[in-house]
Every structure is written in C-alpha cells, then in structure tokens.
C-alpha cells in the first residue's frame, strides 16, 4: 500500500504517539512531544539498541556524558569553525533554505532522480544548479535567491550570572565528543584492550536551517552512538562488520528490506575526518532519508583532542609492543528517525473479510510495541476478576486494561496502536480459569490457561 506522512502524523497525534510541542500556545516550529504511547515506543527502541550494541556485545561498554562541555572541546573537534550548512534565502518569501536539500528535493521530486546527492558540492556548483534548473521557492514560486553562505549550527548559551564571551558555552551538536574526551577514562577503568567500543544514548541540538518531515529532522533530537576503537589498518574490516550488524538489527525488528538501502559516500561527499562512510537509508513516504551513518573517523578526533588538551591518547599494544593512536568506527543512529521508520514501516490498512471497513494495524515487533498485551473483560461485570490478570502481568510487561465499548471496537483500537495480543476474560473464564488470546497480525484466537500467560508473553516479546 502507498503510505503518506499526513496519515501517519494524524494517527500519531490521535493515538498518543507524538504531539506538537507547546500546542496550547500555537506550538513552536519543529518541536514535538512524545505522548504516552510514543515514549513507550521510543524507550523500547533505545532498549533494543542498548541490548544488542552494549549489553550483549563482548566489545562494548556504555557511558552517559554531560550535554554541556568545556568549549575547548568544540574548538578541538572543529565544530566551532566547520560545523556549517549552506544557507540560501528567497527574497520574496523571506524563507530560508538549506541549499543542498533544496536541490536534492527538486532533483528527486521533479526529475525522478532518487539517488541525487548535493552534499559535497561547492557553493558555486550548487548555485549553478539552482540557476540552470530554474529551481523556485515552494512558497513564493520565484527564483529570486540570495547568494549561498555558511550557517553555523551550534546553539550558544551562557554559564553563570553574566552573559559575556568568557561564560559562553554550547549545547552539544553530537554525543560523540563526550565519548572521545572520556576515551582514556573508560579504557583504563574498564581495562579494555583493542578493539572495543563506547556507546551512549543522549540528546543533541542543531540549529537546523530547514528542519521538517515530522520527527525526521528536528533541532532537538536523540542519538544512539557507538565509537568503536581499533588498530589502524583494520578500520575497513570493522566498518563492514558494523554495517552488517546494524542492518541486521533493523531487519530483526521487522523493518522491510525493500525499504532499506546502503549507500556509500563518494570521495567528494566524505567528511574531512572520514576515509569511508556508508549510510543506511530508509524509504520514508517523503523519499529516501538517512537513518544510520557508519563512518570510519580514522584517528582524527583522538589526535585533535590530544593536540588541544596535551593528553596522550596513544595505545600500547600488548601483543606487538607498538604504540599508536587508535582508529575509530562510528555507527551513529538517530533515535527519533528510526522511531519514525518503525512507525512508517508498521503502518498498514487492510481489508477484513466480511466487512466493508478496512482495519488500521501497526505491525510493530512485539519487543517495540508500546503495550505487549491488553486485558479486555468481555463485560464490566467481569472487571474485578480481569484486573487481577492485569496486575499479575504488568509486573513484568507493559499491559493495557480496557473495559469500555464493544469487544470488536476494543480489538480495533489495540490493532491501531500495535498491541500484539489481546487477552479476553469472559464468563467462561470464571469457571475454567482460561482466557481467549487474540493475535494482532493473524487475528487468530486461542484458548489458554491464565497460568500460562506470563510464559507465553515472555517468549513472544523476546528480542
């Protein structure tokens, strides 16, 4: 089926996944609040990432670094001088655009070139394309453009009681630097030998020129990043390892392979610190978008921090007796973007035999579903006994309890929020201590002893 963002955004708001930020005051451009179901979904995504990339990995450990860091961190990393996007304004609409994305949107939508990438083009090359193609502002319909110029993405604030340059600090634009500055702390305290990785989940902030597409590109966002350190010369082998590992993680959580692709950056597109980068992209309703960047950052970051701090980041290899600065592979995933991908991929409208109405169902992997099951008493007269099942199961799983409306409408509501199993407590349950368990995807129903529910759910929602 063809999916569109408007339908998915509407469902997200209607069912409590995502709300517009500051809604009662007219909102704030491109800010979003995760509702009761959205926070459960996103937390489950983060839990699944941490489980596979940290807890179950023989290589990796986790940290939680501060959002506010010494400004020298950003001087060393190059963010203060180089963390820029190409900005262009339309003189008639007064709207500001990111020039490379303006070109990419035009080429993909108007020319049908889904693989066109403007990242890596010079300002002159981008302006030439805009002029030659006659690209116009979507709002004003005119091609009355300013010149392209750099726009720094760092959010600046002040620490302390006086707002002057000596107290100037920045909201971090990525979580990676918190890992690099803690490299030696972690390596020594955990007695780690190469190869090993350090991962974290946390908020980052970028003053994006043209955020948009719901929670895909926002100014406040959450990252799930791993910095994996290895011996120089082994980085491409490890990059390939993490490409495969990350792709499999997505597939295991029910992302359709047809909606995924791996795209290698060409030489012009590579960041200044990288000798190889691959993006895992997802086909959203609005087009292909990056989910996961898997970059070989070489020894750039550790060397830069060594130069600026005076700290020695050389690793003494106990096997070869060599000393060298480790290379780093960075699989960087946006928690909000991948949550949106799971929302889009799970959404389906399907016909129901014997009914003229389609049912909307979210086919989440059970490990990601906000609720693992819903307990539904067939009648409110049965609620007192049915709530005991809720109390029993909710100590181990996220469980919904719903006693209002007909059982059919309750099934549809649970389908629409992605609950894998509905547990119906009926009048026979009072006598035989069994319940009817309905499967979300197949809609098949089986009778099951109440005593077996916990084991059943544990097996079904495992990841």
UniProtKB/Swiss-Prot annotation:
UniProt-annotated binding residues for ATP: 206-208, 216-221, 290-291, 334-337
Which InterPro entries does this entry report, sorted A to Z?
Answer: aa-tRNA-synt_IIb, aa-tRNA-synth_II, aa-tRNA-synth_II/BPL/LPL, Anticodon-bd, Anticodon-bd_dom_sf, Gly-tRNA_synthase/POLG2, Gly_tRNA_ligase_bac, GlyRS-like_core
Q: Which GO terms describe its molecular function?
A: ATP binding; catalytic activity, acting on a protein; glycine-tRNA ligase activity; protein dimerization activity; transferase activity
Q: Which domain of life is it from?
A: Bacteria
Q: Where is this gene product found?
A: Cytoplasm
The keyword 4Fe-4S belongs to this UniProt entry's keyword annotation? no
EC number in record: 6.1.1.14
Listed binding positions for substrate are 98, 174, 221-225, 330-334
Name the reaction it catalyses: tRNA(Gly) + glycine + ATP = glycyl-tRNA(Gly) + AMP + diphosphate
One GO term under biological process is: glycyl-tRNA aminoacylation
Oligomeric state and interaction partners are given as: Homodimer.
Function of this protein?
Catalyzes the attachment of glycine to tRNA(Gly).
* Name of the protein in its database record: Glycine--tRNA ligase
Q: Which organism is it from?
A: Staphylococcus haemolyticus (strain JCSC1435)
């Amino acid at each position: 089926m063809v999916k569109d963002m408007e339908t998915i955004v509407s469902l997200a708001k209607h069912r409590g996944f995502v709300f517009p930020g500051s809604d009662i005051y007219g909102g704030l451009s491109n800010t979003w609040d995760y509702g009761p179901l959205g926070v459960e979904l996103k937390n489950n995504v983060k839990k699944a990432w941490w489980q596979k990339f940290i807890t179950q990995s023989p290589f990796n450990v986790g940290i939680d670094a501060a959002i506010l860091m010494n400004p020298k961190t950003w001087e060393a990393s190059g963010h203060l001088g180089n963390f820029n996007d190409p900005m262009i304004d339309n003189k008639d609409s007064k709207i500001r655009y990111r020039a490379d994305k303006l070109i990419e949107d035009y080429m993909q939508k108007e020319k049908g070139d889904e693989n066109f990438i403007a990242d890596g083009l010079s300002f002159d090359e981008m302006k030439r394309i805009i002029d030659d193609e006659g690209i116009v502002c979507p709002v004003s319909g005119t091609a009355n453009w300013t010149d392209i110029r750099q726009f720094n993405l760092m959010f600046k604030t002040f620490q302390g009681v006086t707002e002057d340059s000596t107290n100037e600090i920045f909201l971090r634009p990525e979580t990676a630097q918190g890992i690099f500055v803690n490299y030696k702390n972690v390596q020594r305290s955990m007695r780690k030998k190469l190869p090993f990785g350090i991962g974290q989940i946390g908020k980052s902030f970028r003053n994006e020129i043209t955020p948009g597409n719901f929670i895909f590109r926002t100014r406040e966002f959450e990252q799930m990043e791993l910095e994996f350190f290895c011996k120089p010369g082994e980085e491409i082998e490890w990059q390939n390892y993490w490409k495969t590992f990350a792709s499999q993680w997505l597939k295991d959580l029910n992302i359709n392979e047809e909606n995924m692709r791996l795209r290698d950056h060409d030489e012009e597109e590579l960041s200044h610190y990288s000798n190889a980068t691959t993006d895992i992209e997802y086909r959203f309703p609005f087009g292909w978008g990056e989910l996961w960047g898997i970059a070989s950052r070489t020894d750039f970051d550790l060397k830069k921090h060594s130069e600026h701090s005076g700290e020695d980041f050389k690793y003494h290899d106990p096997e070869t007796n060599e000393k060298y600065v480790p290379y780093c592979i960075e699989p960087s995933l946006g928690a909000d973007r991948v949550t949106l991908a799971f929302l889009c991929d799970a959404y389906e409208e399907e016909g129901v035999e014997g009914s003229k109405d389609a049912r909307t169902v979210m086919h989440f992997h059970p490990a990601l579903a906000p609720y693992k099951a819903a307990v539904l008493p067939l009648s409110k007269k049965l609620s007192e006994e049915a709530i005991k099942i809720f109390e029993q199961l909710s100590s181990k799983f996220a469980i919904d309890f719903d006693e209002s409306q007909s059982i059919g409408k309750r099934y549809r509501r649970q389908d629409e929020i992605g609950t894998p199993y509905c547990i119906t407590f009926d009048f026979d349950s009072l006598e035989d201590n069994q319940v009817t368990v309905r499967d979300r995807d197949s809609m098949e129903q089986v009778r099951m002893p109440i005593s077996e529910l916990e084991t059943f759910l544990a097996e079904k929602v495992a990841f």
